[in-house]
Amino acid sequence: IDALFITHEHKDHIKGAGIFSRRFDVPIYATMQTWEAMKNDLGKIVPHNQCFVYEDENCVINDICVRPFAIPHDAVQPVGYNIFAGQNKVSIATDLGHVTDTIRESITDSDILLLEANHDEQMLKNGSYPWHLKQRILGENGHISNHTAGNLLAEIMSGKMKYIFLGHLSEENNHPHLAYETVAEILQNSKIQLGGALKMDMAARFSNGAKVTI
């Protein structure tokens, strides 16, 4: 691992990053405002491992180009990432309060896409979360649902897409099979078939996912 790229400063996205950087002398990349917001939680990071990224600007690590794009979330300066290697493109888009034109444009023509499918709306509404937390998740800077993820995929799908990974699933307000079936049904209704040239899998919370080659 040559670098860590941080999307935003929430603790579930930075936990362990500081320890990893110190132990293996690995740089941490984030937007300037994100760095300011997370620096106390990371602990001491040597200056040469404090690195910045800028929205829509390329950051080159060896033979890989990383380009952040803006996302709406309740953080100071959150981003998703596009990762380019040769003609191949991998997109990472989680913690999306809602879908913007920037997100649509950024994840179009990806070979591999990791997309948030955070919750089932009925499970969330009927679940045990307090009202203010439900409102935060459902709000413009919260998280997108299985249905929203499916509709976005149907909208931006191209023949270049090979793998979809659904990620950032809520433990309490979603199930992997429910997220998969909801998204698969929306794609099928849009005449997009899974299982041949296009595959979809879940990004597991506590274990490694499938290894894919493009």
Where do the PLM segments sit?
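Structural motif
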Residues: 2-3, 88-90, 112, 163
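Metal-dependent catalytic neighborhoods of phosphoester/phosphodiester hydrolases
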Residues: 15-24, 39-42, 174-181
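Metallo-beta-lactamase
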Residues: 32-87
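Short, basic/aromatic-enriched C-terminal tail that caps enzymatic domains
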Residues: 198-214
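Divalent metal-coordination and catalytic microenvironments
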Residues: 8, 28, 66, 73, ...
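Cap/insert and terminal regions of metallo-dependent hydrolase folds
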Residues: 101-201
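Active-site metal-binding motif and surrounding structural segment of the metallo-beta-lactamase
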Residues: 1-31
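Active-site environment of divalent metal-dependent phosphoester hydrolases
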Residues: 10-14, 35-38, 75-76, 98-101, ...
